[in-house]
């Protein structure tokens, strides 16, 4: 079933109101209990995120995969190991410096792209995470995550290589750098050199 645009806007507004006054612990509970879209029906775990609090960097991926859904943690398995190595190459670690989250908190079936109503259900949680963590900068990994966070349809090739700005609900401007998702880099290792350039840009930013 395709949701009407008006219904999606109402859903997003209602969830944003619920998330607005929550601290991180309360927000995590809201995510774990969320039944706002159909993704809740097939999940093992809602993946809230993990890492440093407060965080110098926030890393935002797309959605949990099979391993993340099973363990309830973001970026595990081969993609997680590559992400950790990427962060360590610029002196960062997920335990000390970085909080890692996804745009979508529950795994879409077959790792398909999320539907508009699923994005509407999860976006208020991510925006509240950003507000509470107040990172110095955000590293966004993957086309879908970048397009969602920056509200654009531009390709990742057009988005990477420069610093963007995210305006928070509190009026702050946070630098955003876009790069490739680690899963893509595992399939296309020739792009790792460009991902390294993106990391250096984020570290300078």
Feature map (PLM): residue ranges:
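A polyanion-binding, active-site-adjacent surface
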Residues: 1-205
């Amino acid at each position: 079933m395709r949701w009407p645009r008006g219904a999606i806007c109402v859903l997003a507004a209602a969830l944003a109101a619920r998330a607005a006054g929550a601290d991180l612990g309360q927000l995590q509970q809201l995510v774990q209990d969320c039944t706002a879209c159909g993704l809740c029906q097939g999940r093992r775990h809602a993946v809230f995120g993990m890492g440093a609090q407060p965080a110098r960097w926030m890393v935002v991926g797309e959605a949990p995969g099979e391993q993340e859904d099973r363990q309830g943690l973001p970026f595990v398995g081969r993609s997680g190991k590559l992400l950790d190595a990427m962060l360590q190459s610029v002196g960062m670690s997920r335990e000390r410096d970085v909080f890692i989250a996804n745009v979508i908190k529950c795994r879409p079936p077959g790792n398909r792209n999320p539907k508009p109503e699923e994005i509407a259900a999860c976006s208020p949680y991510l925006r509240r995470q950003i507000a509470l963590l107040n990172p110095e900068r955000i590293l966004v990994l993957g086309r879908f995550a970048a397009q969602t966070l920056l509200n654009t349809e531009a390709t990742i090739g057009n988005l990477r290589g420069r610093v963007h700005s995210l305006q928070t609900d509190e009026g702050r401007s946070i630098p955003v750098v876009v790069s490739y998702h680690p899963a893509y880099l595992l399939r296309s290792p020739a792009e790792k050199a460009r991902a390294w350039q993106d990391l250096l840009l984020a570290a300078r930013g």
